[in-house]
Amino acid sequence: IVESQSMAGGNSVRATGGMNAGKTAYQDENTFGEEAGVEKTLKSAADSYADNAAVTELAQTVTAQWQAYQANPEGYFDSVELMELDTMIGGKAVNDVELVKALCANSAEAIDWLTTIGANLTSVGSFGGASVKRIHRPVDADGKTISVGTYIVPVLEKACQDRGVEFLFD
């Protein structure tokens, strides 16, 4: 790994939010109360992006998922497609659709993988652009949410070192 600075992480070490991931086990530990967020996203898709085939198709899928959830509200409502829809709307529907699909489809697996190397992003909360609680953040020993960058970069650096990955600094 080539780092332009004398330490690992670059701008990532400054990240304070968390990592967005859809349909994770950590989300299921929360009580769902974001009905208004889902409705707002579906309305935005219909009102502002009716001429965009990708957004319209996602909105149709999410509408069916949302109706099924409302008929049988078990667990926390989220889906890969809702995350895709939020991402497309956040990008004003000019996103690379295939890249959005890849990002969203692999997001829960990424959270699971991070857990295997000791990067536990167990706190799930709301953040701008997401219709539901989807941002995964680390917590300290007291259960207080902490900055993701200063937490995750050392964990990732150690995982790389444990696997013999060479770092080149400066």
Where are these regions (language model features)?
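Residues forming the flavin
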Residues: I1-A54, L121-G125, R137-D170
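Glycine-rich active-site loop/strand segments that organize a redox cofactor
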Residues: N20-L103
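Conserved redox-cofactor binding core of oxidoreductases
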Residues: S79-T87, G91-D170
